[in-house]
């Protein structure tokens, strides 16, 4: 799914990455919230795939830093997650249980999805008396 959002002009370059840690209070009061931070999820990482051109100087200014804002197309980055299942098939869809994060650090709790699509198996590791897979997964929610 294509997501168009706003980012400051100095950061707007194709291939650039950023992570939304937390949405600042000032953003909730901004008239551009719905097309800027409102389209992004805290804790998730994004990659800029396209910078949309503006024919005129941007009328959009960020309330936090005063920078000129430009529209960009972003793609959500995949997450590295532990999955504790008897077997994993790349391309399969599974539920994610945050209790699996005991042996491997996970993204922040608000970034954890309830369902994921397994993109790639990275490793198999032992945790206590059991095993889990470390996978690259695409969040489905």
From Swiss-Prot:
Residues making up the signal peptide according to the UniProt record: none
Superkingdom of this protein's organism: Archaea
InterPro entries: UPF0179
Sequence similarity: Belongs to the UPF0179 family.
HAMAP family from the UniProt entry: UPF0179
Protein name: UPF0179 protein Cmaq_1008
Organism listed in the record: Caldivirga maquilingensis (strain ATCC 700844 / DSM 13496 / JCM 10307 / IC-167)
């Amino acid at each position: 799914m294509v997501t168009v959002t706003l980012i400051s002009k100095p950061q707007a370059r194709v291939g650039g990455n950023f992570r939304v840690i937390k949405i600042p209070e000032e953003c909730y009061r901004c008239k551009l919230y719905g097309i800027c931070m409102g389209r992004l999820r805290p804790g998730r990482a994004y990659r800029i795939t396209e910078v949309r051109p503006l024919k005129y100087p941007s009328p959009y200014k960020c309330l936090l830093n005063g920078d000129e804002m430009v529209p960009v197309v972003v793609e959500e980055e995949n997450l590295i997650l532990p999955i504790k299942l008897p077997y994993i098939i790349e391309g399969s869809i599974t539920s994610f249980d945050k209790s699996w994060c005991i042996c491997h650090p996970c993204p922040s709790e608000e970034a954890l999805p309830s369902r994921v699509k397994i993109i790639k198996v990275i490793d198999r590791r032992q945790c206590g008396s059991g095993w889990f897979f470390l996978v690259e997964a695409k969040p489905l929610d």
